[in-house]
């Protein structure tokens, strides 16, 4: 039974397709259930009632979520799913003896607002901050398992953030170093004359890769920051047009050179193919390509709006076939064990593993059936997105 069906049972109406609306309505229904029939109603709500409501929400909501909500007369409640798939960070600030707290998906928010970084909200944990500044927390799941989404480190997070004790910047440096070692093993006579990143999330890995290989690092593309993510746009023509507007090449960095282009990942392949075309149009004599992430071949069901499987460039293709599609001399993907090692950090974290489902098809929450995946894909394919955008 999906959350929408469960909320109809609770006599709650969902007005949008937002998963946040559904999740918080589920939590609100559990809060209401806690005080039903109790003298005083919501005024009699106790701290233990809130923790129990979060516990029941965990049992009823499968998947990934980090939630922050307000309860009238009480204060703020923040909670994270039992696998900690999505990040949730807490900062603290003291003003004349009053303790302020801030919650956000990334630690960098604390620096921007002048708060001290406190800690990550743990998997399955709920945090209550009262109006008077008092604070309490409890892990509201009997068996939380910490498996955050590895794609946060690859692409989504800002490099100056720290996620679950691991520096995003440091993780991307290690991704670049791992790629460099692969190149040295598999292409010892690579002939690379310049390493060029795809801005912005490919930059840090490209810098470290260039340093490890002893090859010049060059900024060959200028990014238009007013164009959104192309891999989630509906329709091939729209994506191709957006790629043209999103990046512009600097010809002197390509003319007559053998260049290695480094990007964080390859999804549909449209951006990669157009970038390779731009490098060749700018005069590159050879173009190689490296991805900080392994091939994406499985749907993400934990909050990332990725395409249907048959729209991934890696779906049903070998590396050689992908190389031909994007038009490069050779193509190198990060290997999953190397990516996991890069994101685990320097051994100063209690993380054991990550959710890597878009790479290996192993969904950490369990219960993801082919029927469910087919339903998700029917809502994400190009035809569905074009219909929704009309």
Outline where the language-model segments fall.
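Flexible loop/turn segments at secondary-structure boundaries
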Residues: 76, 85-87, 110-112, 135-136, ...
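A conserved beta-strand->alpha-helix junction
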Residues: 21-26, 217-228, 325-343
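Extended, hydrophobic alpha-helical segments in both membrane/secreted and soluble proteins
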Residues: 195, 202-209, 213, 217, ...
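Conserved short alpha-helical segments that host acidic/polar catalytic motifs at enzyme active sites
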Residues: 4-123, 128-193, 198, 286
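PRPP-dependent phosphoribosyltransferase catalytic core
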Residues: 57-58, 73-75, 80, 99, ...
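Flexible glycine/proline-rich, aromatic-decorated loop/lid segments
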Residues: 99-106, 145-146, 230-244, 289, ...
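Short internal beta-strands
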Residues: 15, 221, 288-291
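Short, glycine/charge-rich flexible loops or terminal/linker lids adjacent to PRPP-binding catalytic cores
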Residues: 212-259, 270, 298-303, 307
């Amino acid at each position: 039974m999906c959350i929408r069906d469960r909320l109809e049972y609770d006599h709650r109406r969902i007005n949008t397709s937002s998963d946040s609306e559904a999740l918080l309505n589920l939590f609100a229904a559990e809060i209401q259930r806690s005080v039903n029939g109790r003298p005083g109603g919501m005024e009699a709500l106790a701290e233990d009632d809130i923790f129990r409501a979060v516990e029941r929400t965990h049992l009823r909501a499968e998947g990934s979520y980090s939630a922050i909500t307000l309860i009238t007369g009480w204060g703020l409640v923040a909670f994270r799913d039992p696998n900690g798939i999505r990040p949730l960070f807490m900062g603290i600030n003291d003003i004349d003896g009053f303790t302020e707290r801030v919650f956000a998906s990334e630690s960098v928010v604390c620096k921007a607002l002048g708060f001290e970084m406190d800690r990550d909200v743990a998997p399955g944990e709920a945090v209550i901050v009262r109006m008077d500044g008092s604070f309490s927390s409890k892990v509201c799941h009997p068996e939380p398992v910490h498996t955050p989404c590895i794609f946060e480190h690859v692409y989504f997070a800002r490099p100056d953030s720290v996620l679950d004790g691991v520096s995003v910047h440091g993780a991307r440096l290690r991704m670049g170093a791992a790629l460099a070692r692969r190149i040295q093993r598999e292409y010892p006579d690579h002939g690379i004359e310049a390493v060029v990143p795809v801005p912005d999330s490919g930059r840090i890995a490209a810098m470290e890769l260039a340093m490890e290989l002893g090859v010049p690092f060059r900024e060959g593309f200028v990014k238009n920051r007013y164009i959104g993510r192309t891999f989630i746009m509906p329709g091939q023509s729209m994506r191709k047009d957006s790629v043209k507007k999103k990046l512009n090449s600097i010809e002197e960095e390509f003319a007559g050179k053998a260049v290695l282009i480094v990007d964080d990942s390859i999804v549909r392949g449209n951006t990669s193919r157009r970038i390779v075309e731009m490098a060749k149009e700018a005069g590159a004599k050879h173009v190689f390509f490296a991805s900080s992430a392994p091939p994406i071949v499985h749907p993400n069901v934990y909050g990332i709006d990725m395409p249907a499987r048959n729209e991934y460039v890696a779906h049903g293709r070998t590396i050689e076939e992908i190389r031909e599609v994007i038009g490069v001399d050779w193509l190198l993907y990060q290997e999953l064990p190397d990516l996991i090692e890069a994101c685990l950090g320097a051994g100063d974290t209690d993380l054991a593993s990550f959710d890597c489902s878009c790479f290996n098809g192993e969904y950490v929450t369990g219960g993801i059936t082919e029927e469910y995946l087919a339903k998700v894909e029917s809502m994400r394919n190009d035809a569905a997105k074009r219909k929704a955008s009309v």
